[in-house]
């Protein structure tokens, strides 16, 4: 949800001495978190409105023209290549010394021999995203309304100088997905009353009765359906101020009718939809489930297959709208439309969510329906839309409203006492103060002896029980005003479980190695598994579906932590963090069967990610990037600290680079997998790789852990060393060679390590030279060459037989 600081001031008075950030802090502290504050137009200077009075061809360039502009107090001559300029137009002009987004500076110059005293600006050059512009505004100069004053600050005049807030609202606060809802909250926090718009509609002589029929066939999925009719409609552009407010909310203007429905949705949080009345067969609207095999072409001109579980709004012949998700192309409002039906309805949120997910569609409207909305506000929203269109002179309003309200919204009453709330919060707030706080939030309170009953306002669908009342009291009273108190109950010290101790131990090892622990959502999408190259028959796709996901992006319980960490990496790269070293210890979830009928399997995993530079550049040293051996070293450090001896082998794990992937195993049990992320995965996430990752499986580690360190007596006698240089095929695996040496090294072999790799001219094609250092020692006496000759011979013979090795 985005809101404009300028728009907010229609409803509340904001202290000008407070900064925009302080305004955001007030809401955040009270539980309405502001995720981001965008300062629109702050980097734009010296852009003035000017009127084109004369256009002549450039004498030295066929594709350029010379414009003379009235700037109010002077005239300017500007050369442009734009093809949409006309005499009499008012346009934004960047004069000499102007600053534009991206650090662009404008100065007086000559273009093909003619002086240009500035630049005519497009909307894009003033910072507006193309996706928020009308088609005709995406190329050429931005043409401003005819009534725009000349010679004034273009940024202020066009509403581009503003502060836009982006909120990270929790799904339960559906009431705050609107300007009015946010204004109510701020009004309470700043001890004032929100100034809500006064809605009055001047109805015309025509009546809606007899001209439109509305039927609700499925009251489970559609609780209320209200409609108004507008006639003598003139479809065109909406007012400039409305277009700008919609853009700041992230919505692209289309035409005055559609823009008004979107404007009212953002203002009141209740979606509306507009139909061309003359395109509705039988002049009838029916809220019903889709028929078997039914299809609809939606507004994006894509034909979509419907299922019998989906709610549609149909005319007498066919589906005209996917309810709450997207309208139908066949009933779209166009410039030829003269009669419009406005719809405002209350649909079941879970149904809209499932329909949107099945069709791959999500909109501002569906996001609000999914969270639930105030059914009582439907007619009020209809009237507001009719009022706005009427004020534009775009229509007349037919008398009457059709309102089918088959399942009225329940009025919630919550019983509580001041003592229970105070016990719950650890506070000492008076009963009178609680009643006063609730009253400012729209609750009415009745008292019966010591029991208070709060009547919940219809827009607060999240309040259902006493703790909700306590939360409302606490956040308005001020969390910062609640004093710390000691718990009144007896507390006994618990003991740390073994698994918890192991998790803490692993966390300590990874943190000491320079990684940061993260905590992410336990959800994922099928798309994230595809990005990581898991095949469709992979067990990772056997995921637990969520009945009420917090967003459509996360419909499943995760079966791997990798997507979560990749999302963290993407966000960090977006803000130019060039070093990411993170890990997470969390659960993954696998169903025993689908559909889920019993408790799912929950397994703890430790997943990490390394990206960027291990060390930063300094004057004598270059920066060094992470590599395969960093993740390998982390795995060895963890396993060694747990007293686990495992074998290394090549891994074929789908997300990993085929040539840079490994795993540690004990027998057939995989303890961990690690390596470089597959280049295709990196591309799928649009990350500038390489990325190194690891996964450890706690349930497989636990039975093997030996935290009692092995004791090795320090040898009293000297060791003998032998260096073996062998030629082996390049396909030979280092781990296999080590296993052969250890197996045939006999009782005196104390250690072995690879100390040289050579593949120069003296080595045959297809081979590589490996040099191993072998250490032999006896606890009983000094070894002679004869004592170790046989083990060395056995090693060479076994290497030759099993690995095709030759002694150099």
Q: What is the meaning of each model-derived region?
A:
Residues 4, 11-12, 23-25, 65, ...:
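Glycine/proline-enriched, intrinsically flexible loops and inter-domain linkers
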Residues 190-216, 393-421, 428:
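Terminal amphipathic helices with adjacent charged low-complexity linkers/tails
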Residues 115-127, 138-142, 155, 163, ...:
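Mobile "lid/hinge" segments at catalytic clefts and subdomain interfaces of large enzymes
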Residues 3-10, 161-170, 223-231, 364-371, ...:
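Short, hydrophobic beta-strand segments
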Residues 49-79, 150-151, 244, 255, ...:
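Conserved mixed alpha/beta core segments that line enzyme active sites in large multi-domain catalysts
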Residues 414-580, 722, 775-778, 787, ...:
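Extended, well-folded interaction surfaces typified by the phenylalanyl-tRNA synthetase beta subunit core
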